[in-house]
């Protein structure tokens, strides 16, 4: 069953979101690179994961601006990390969530970290999985993949 999709405004962009479950804690899940609210419920493994999260929380999921059911963005006006971070705030406001655990997956990690640092009073916990502090390896961060490793992964 696909939950009801709602929309809220963040600046001049409509952000699609869903709320699932009735647990004692709000949990905002921030997907990685792309997402699609309706498709995620069609993928059996992802649907099991989401249902498990919703079994102990009030799970709030959304499509980042430019992805899934949220408004598209112009190629020459790609969103900043700060704009996407403010989308989290807009979704939480629309869902009636004053404070939530923030769960960042992959590319959602930096976004989650920025939100937690900007809105500490609204962040009950910060959970990160598969996230990098930096996307590309550098002298001060030798643990990240190289540009060539990223490019090879996208070509595969």
Where does each model-flagged region fall?
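Short, hydrophobic/aromatic-rich segments at coil-to-beta transitions
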Residues: 1-6
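Conserved HGGG/HGGXW glycine-rich cap/lid loop of the alpha/beta-hydrolase fold
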Residues: 7-71
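Conserved acidic catalytic loop of the alpha/beta-hydrolase fold
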Residues: 82-100
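Gly/Ala-rich beta-loop-alpha elbow adjacent to hydrolase catalytic centers
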Residues: 104-108, 112
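Flexible "cap/lid" loop of the alpha/beta hydrolase fold
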Residues: 113, 117, 123-155
